[in-house]
C-alpha cells in the first residue's frame, strides 16, 4: 500500500521540477516530440486523473493543492476514500520523502517540504496564463478558420433608422459575423451570442422575422473584428442591444433560429469533460490536432446541462461576457487561502465522483424518470406489390363490349372541356387502392435522398434529387387504371426502412378537401436529414376522345442540415382512345425542380407519343440541369427505362437512371400499418369491401360498395351544413396567408446524434425519442390547441409543438403560453390578417392616386413649357434667317 501511495501521489513540489520527470515503474513516459495540447476545459478533470498515474501518456500538469490530493482515492478506489482521508498525514509524508522519484533532483524531503504556498501559487498562475493563451488562440483560430461554419447566408437586418440592409451573415460557435460581401472582406460587426436570446418576431413583410437581443439591454457587439479590425465597414447604424433579422422564407428563418439556438449555447468551444458516447469521435485521440469540426461544435451544445456544466470563460473574459466567476482573474489576484481552499474543494468533489473516467456518465444523459416503453404504431411488411412492364404494353387496354356501353353512358353526361371531378366513374377502370396510397410510389428509392443530404456539392445534390424524382414513375399498374378518389378525412400511413443508415422514412397523407379534391402529404426522415411536404389538387378535363388528369400543386423537399428547399411540380396523365382506337395512358407536361438558395434547377419535359410515332416515342422525356440560366447538362431517354445525361462541358454521355432488375430488387421495402390498428378512415380499411369486389371482378358489388361510401360522405356534408359546422382536418392545417397545407406535427430540426435516439409514429404523429428533453426552437406555422395526439405524447419524446414562453420586456407584444389555436382555422386571426391586407391595399391605393395626381398636374406645365421653348427657338431661327437674307441682299 505504501508503494502504491508513493508511486501514485505526486507531491506539489514534484510538479515544480523539470518537464522530463523520472516516473515510477507503473508510469509510461510520453513522447517528448509529440505536442501535448492541454486546454482549460480539460484542466480540472486531468488534475483529478493524473493524481493517480495509469498506463497512459504523462503530461506536464499544473500543480494541485494538498486538499485536492488528499481527496483523491489514488489506486484504492472509491471505497477507500474515507480511510485515505484519515491517513492523509502519513501519505503526505511518504510521498514527500520519495518526491525525488518525480522531479529527478537529489533534494531531500526536508527541502521539498519548505516550498511556500506563494511559490506554488506562482506556478499555478503561470500554468493558468499559458492555458488561457492557448484557449484564446484556439478560439481565434476557430473564428478565422473558414471550415468552421455552422451556417452562412444573406439576411436582411434592420438598422436604427428602421431601414433594411442586406448583409452576409456567417454563424460560428458563439459568434455571428456580419460582412458586407460574401467574400468576408468587409467586416461590419461581430455579435457575441453568449449573452443573447432569440425570439420570433411578427412582421407584415415577406419572409421570416426574428429578433436577437440582450435580456438586460446591454451591448451585444464585440469590440474588435476577427482579424483585429477596430472599425467596421460603413453601413447604416445598427442597434447596440438587439438585431432584428429577416430571412427570405419561413423555412430559412426557422433553420436560422435552430442554428442560432445551438450556436448561442456554444459559448465555449472546449469541454471540461467527455462523455462515453463521444469517445468514438476522436476527441482525445489526436492531441496534436486543433482543427474543430462542425460536428464537434454542434455536439458540444448538448453535452452538458444543469449544475455540473460550468462554462470555460478564459478565452472570452476580456470581452466581458456573462460573469461566471469561475477561476476569474479577480479571484486569482487575491491570495486568500480560504478562496484557494474553496476552489480545491470543488476539484476534490469532482475527483471524488470521477475517479474512474471509463465508468463515469454525464448527467445530461441520465433520465430522471424511468424509461417508459416506446408506444408506436405497428407496421407490417407489404406482402404483394405490382410492377408494370416498361414501355407501352402495360399502358394500353382493350375495352370489352360490356364496358364500352358503360363508357357511352358516361359520355352522355359530359361535354368537351368539362371538369370530371364530380362525375362518378365506372369501377372497371379503378385501380384497387386510394390516390393517397399511389402518391407514396415516389419513396421506394428514398435512399437517394439520404445520399443527396450528405452530398457537399450542390450540383451533385441536384442530380441525386432528379434521379430520385425519376425513380417514382416506373411503378405502374397493368392496364389503364385510376385510383380511388379519397373520401374527405381519409388518411394513409406507411414507412420504409433504410438498411444502410438504420433509419425510417415516414409517409403521412390525408384528404383535406373534397370539393375541390385536395390531398396533403408529409414525408420525414430526420435521421437522414430530409423531409418533404406538399398538397395536390386533382383535376380532370374531357376533350372528346381523350381526357387529362391534371395534378396542380407542388411538393417541397427540405434538407434539414442545409436549409435548402427544392420545389417541384407534377406531370399530368393523359388518356386517349376513349371513343375510338386503343385506350392508352401517358404522362405529359413540363416539370420544374428549383432550389432558390443554390440557384440550381432542373426542367423535365414528359412528351406524349406523336400521332404517327412508333413505340420508341412512348414515354419519352428530355430535360436540362441549369445553374441560373446556364445549362450544365441535358437529359434524354424514357422515364420508365433508360435516361442518359450529357455534360455540356465535357460532352460526355452516360446512363443517368435505369430501373434494371437489380435496381428494382434493391428498392426499399414498404411497411403499412397493421390492419387491426388502422382507424376506420384509413385507406385500406375504408375501401376494403370495394377492393375485395374489384379483385373478385365483381363490378356490381364494387359499384354498390363504392356508392355506400360516397353517399355517407355526402350525408355527412349535409349534416355539417345543417349544423353550420366546418370540417376540421386531423393531421394537416391550412395557412390562411399562403393557402398551403402544412402537417401539424412537423419537426424540421437537424438530427442530433447525441440526443435524438429514434424517430417513430403513433396515431399519425411523427415523433422523436430523445435522451434529454429540451424545448424545441422551431415554431409551427400556425398555433393551435393541443389535439388528442399531442396529449398522448409522453415526457421524454420530442414534441412537435413547442412550449411558447413569455418574452421579457424587450418586445412590446408578449406571447402567452396558453395561446394555442383551436383545431382548424381561427376566424379571429383570419380577420386580423384580412384587415392588415386591407390597410396595405388602401395605403397602396393612396400612393397610386397621389402619384397619378402628381403626374397629371405636372404634365400640362411641362408640355406648356416645351411648347414655349419650341416657339422661341423657331422665332430665333426665323429672325436669323431674315437678318442673313437682309445682309446678303
Swiss-Prot record:
The chain crosses the membrane at residues 871-888. Residues 781-794 have a biased composition (Basic residues). Its main location: endoplasmic reticulum. InterPro entries: OSBP_sf (IPR037239), Oxysterol-bd (IPR000648), Oxysterol-bd_CS (IPR018494), PH-like_dom_sf (IPR011993), PH_domain (IPR001849). It is a single-pass membrane protein. Residues 148-265 form the PH domain. The modification Phosphoserine is found at residues 14, 65, 68, 314, 328, 342, 807-808, 810, 814. It is found in: Endoplasmic reticulum membrane; Nucleus membrane. The modification N-acetylmethionine is found at residue 1. SUPFAM superfamilies: Oxysterol-binding protein-like, PH domain-like. Widely expressed. Most abundant in liver, spleen, kidney, brain and adipose tissue. SMART domains: PH. Residues 1-129, 321-374, 772-823 are annotated as: Disordered. Pfam families: Oxysterol_BP (PF01237), PH (PF00169). One of its GO terms (biological process) is positive regulation of insulin receptor signaling pathway. Keywords: Acetylation, Endoplasmic reticulum, Lipid transport, Lipid-binding, Membrane, Nucleus, Phosphoprotein, Transmembrane, Transmembrane helix, Transport. Residues 62-71, 805-817 have a biased composition (Polar residues). Residues 73-88, 95-109, 116-129, 321-336, 346-363 have a biased composition (Basic and acidic residues). One of its GO terms (molecular function) is phosphatidylinositol-4-phosphate binding. A 1,2-diacyl-sn-glycero-3-phospho-(1D-myo-inositol 4-phosphate) binds at residues 420-425, 482-485, 514-515, 706, 710, 714. Lipid transporter involved in lipid countertransport between the endoplasmic reticulum and the plasma membrane: specifically exchanges phosphatidylserine with phosphatidylinositol 4-phosphate (PI4P), delivering phosphatidylserine to the plasma membrane in exchange for PI4P, which is degraded by the SAC1/SACM1L phosphatase in the endoplasmic reticulum. Binds phosphatidylserine and PI4P in a mutually exclusive manner. Binds oxysterol, 25-hydroxycholesterol and cholesterol. Belongs to the OSBP family. Interacts with SPAG5. Interacts with NUP62. This is Oxysterol-binding protein-related protein 8. The gene is Osbpl8.
Amino acid at each position: 500500500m505504501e508503494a502504491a501511495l508513493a508511486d501514485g501521489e505526486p507531491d506539489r513540489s514534484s510538479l515544480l521540477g523539470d518537464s522530463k520527470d523520472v516516473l515510477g515503474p507503473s508510469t509510461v513516459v510520453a513522447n517528448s516530440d509529440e505536442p501535448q495540447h492541454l486546454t482549460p476545459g480539460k484542466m480540472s478533470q486531468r488534475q483529478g486523473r493524473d493524481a493517480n498515474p495509469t498506463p497512459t501518456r504523462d503530461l506536464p500538469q499544473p500543480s494541485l493543492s494538498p486538499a485536492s490530493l488528499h481527496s483523491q482515492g489514488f489506486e484504492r478506489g472509491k471505497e477507500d476514500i474515507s480511510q485515505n482521508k484519515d491517513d492523509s498525514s502519513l501519505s503526505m509524508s511518504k510521498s514527500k520523502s520519495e518526491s525525488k522519484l518525480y522531479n529527478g533532483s537529489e533534494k531531500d524531503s526536508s527541502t521539498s517540504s519548505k516550498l511556500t504556498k506563494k511559490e506554488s501559487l506562482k506556478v499555478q498562475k503561470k500554468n493558468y496564463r499559458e492555458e488561457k493563451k492557448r484557449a484564446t488562440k484556439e478560439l481565434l483560430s476557430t473564428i478565422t478558420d473558414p471550415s468552421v461554419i455552422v451556417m452562412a447566408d444573406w439576411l436582411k437586418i434592420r438598422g436604427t433608422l428602421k431601414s433594411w440592409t442586406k448583409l452576409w451573415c456567417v454563424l460560428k460557435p458563439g459568434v455571428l459575423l456580419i460582412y458586407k460581401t460574401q467574400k468576408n472582406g468587409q467586416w461590419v460587426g461581430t455579435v457575441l451570442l453568449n449573452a443573447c436570446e432569440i425570439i420570433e418576431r411578427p412582421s407584415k413583410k415577406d419572409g421570416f422575422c426574428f429578433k436577437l437581443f440582450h435580456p438586460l439591454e446591454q451591448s451585444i457587439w464585440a469590440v474588435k473584428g476577427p482579424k483585429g479590425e477596430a472599425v467596421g465597414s460603413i453601413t447604416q447604424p445598427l442597434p447596440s442591444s438587439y438585431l432584428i433579422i429577416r430571412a427570405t422564407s419561413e423555412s430559412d428563418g426557422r433553420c436560422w433560429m435552430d442554428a442560432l439556438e445551438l450556436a448561442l449555447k456554444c459559448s465555449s468551444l472546449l469541454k471540461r469533460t467527455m462523455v462515453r458516447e463521444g469517445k468514438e469521435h476522436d476527441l482525445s485521440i489526436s492531441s496534436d490536432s486543433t482543427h474543430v469540426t462542425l460536428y464537434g461544435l454542434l455536439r458540444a451544445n448538448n453535452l452538458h446541462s444543469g449544475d455540473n456544466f460550468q462554462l470555460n470563460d478564459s478565452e472570452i473574459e476580456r470581452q466581458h461576457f456573462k460573469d461566471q466567476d469561475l477561476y476569474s482573474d479577480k479571484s486569482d489576484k487575491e491570495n486568500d487561502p480560504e478562496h484557494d481552499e474553496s476552489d480545491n474543494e470543488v476539484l476534490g468533489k469532482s475527483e471524488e465522483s470521477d475517479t474512474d473516467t471509463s465508468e463515469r456518465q454525464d448527467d445530461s444523459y441520465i433520465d430522471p424518470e424511468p424509461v417508459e416503453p416506446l408506444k408506436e404504431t405497428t407496421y407490417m411488411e407489404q406482402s404483394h406489390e405490382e410492377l408494370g412492364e416498361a414501355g407501352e404494353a402495360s399502358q394500353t387496354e382493350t375495352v370489352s363490349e360490356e364496358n364500352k356501353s358503360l363508357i357511352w353512358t358516361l359520355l352522355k353526361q359530359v361535354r368537351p372541356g368539362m371538369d370530371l371531378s364530380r362525375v362518378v366513374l365506372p369501377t372497371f377502370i379503378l385501380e384497387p387502392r386510394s390516390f393517397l396510397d399511389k402518391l407514396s410510389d415516389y419513396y421506394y428509392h428514398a435512399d437517394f435522398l439520404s445520399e443527396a443530404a450528405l452530398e457537399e456539392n450542390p450540383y451533385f445534390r441536384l442530380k441525386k434529387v432528379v434521379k430520385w424524382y425519376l425513380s417514382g414513375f416506373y411503378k405502374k399498374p397493368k392496364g389503364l387504371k385510376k385510383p380511388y378518389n379519397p373520401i374527405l378525412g381519409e388518411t394513409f400511413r406507411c414507412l420504409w426502412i433504410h438498411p444502410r443508415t438504420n433509419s425510417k422514412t415516414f409517409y403521412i397523407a390525408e384528404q383535406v378537401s373534397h370539393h375541390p379534391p385536395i390531398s396533403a402529404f408529409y414525408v420525414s426522415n430526420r435521421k437522414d436529414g430530409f423531409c418533404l411536404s406538399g398538397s395536390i389538387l386533382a383535376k380532370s378535363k374531357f376533350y372528346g376522345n381523350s381526357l387529362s388528369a391534371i395534378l396542380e400543386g407542388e411538393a417541397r423537399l427540405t434538407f434539414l442540415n442545409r436549409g435548402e428547399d427544392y420545389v417541384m411540380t407534377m406531370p399530368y396523365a393523359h388518356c386517349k382512345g376513349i371513343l375510338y382506337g386503343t385506350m392508352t395512358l401517358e404522362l405529359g407536361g413540363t416539370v420544374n425542380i428549383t432550389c432558390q438558395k443554390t440557384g440550381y434547377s432542373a426542367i423535365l419535359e414528359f412528351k406524349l407519343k406523336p400521332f404517327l410515332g412508333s413505340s420508341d416515342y412512348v414515354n419519352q422525356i428530355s430535360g436540362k440541369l441549369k445553374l441560373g440560366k446556364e445549362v450544365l447538362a441535358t437529359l434524354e431517354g424514357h422515364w420508365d427505362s433508360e435516361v442518359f445525361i450529357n455534360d455540356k462541358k465535357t460532352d460526355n454521355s452516360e446512363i443517368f437512371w435505369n430501373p434494371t432488375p437489380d435496381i428494382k430488387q434493391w428498392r426499399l421495402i414498404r411497411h403499412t400499418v397493421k390492419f387491426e390498428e388502422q382507424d376506420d378512415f384509413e385507406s385500406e380499411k375504408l375501401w376494403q369491401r370495394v377492393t375485395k369486389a374489384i379483385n373478385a371482378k365483381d363490378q356490381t358489388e364494387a359499384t354498390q360498395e363504392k356508392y355506400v361510401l360516397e353517399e355517407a360522405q355526402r350525408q355527412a356534408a349535409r349534416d355539417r351544413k345543417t349544423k353550420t359546422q366546418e370540417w376540421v382536418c386531423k393531421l394537416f392545417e391550412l395557412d390562411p396567408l399562403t393557402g398551403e397545407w402544412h402537417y401539424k406535427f412537423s419537426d424540421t430540426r437537424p438530427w442530433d446524434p447525441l440526443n435524438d435516439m429514434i424517430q417513430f409514429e403513433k396515431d399519425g404523429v411523427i415523433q422523436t425519442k430523445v435522451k434529454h428533453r429540451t424545448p424545441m426552437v422551431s415554431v409551427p406555422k400556425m398555433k393551435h390547441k393541443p389535439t388528442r395526439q399531442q396529449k398522448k405524447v409522453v415526457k421524454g419524446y420530442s414534441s412537435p409543438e413547442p412550449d411558447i414562453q413569455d418574452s421579457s420586456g424587450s418586445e412590446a407584444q408578449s406571447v402567452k403560453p396558453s395561446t394555442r389555436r383551436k383545431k382548424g382555422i381561427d376566424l379571429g386571426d383570419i380577420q386580423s390578417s384580412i384587415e392588415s391586407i386591407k390597410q396595405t391595399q388602401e395605403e397602396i391605393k393612396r400612393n397610386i392616386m397621389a402619384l397619378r395626381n402628381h403626374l397629371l398636374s405636372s404634365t400640362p406645365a411641362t408640355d406648356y413649357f416645351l411648347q414655349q421653348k419650341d416657339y422661341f427657338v423657331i422665332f430665333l431661327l426665323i429672325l436669323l434667317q431674315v437678318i442673313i437674307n437682309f445682309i446678303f441682299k
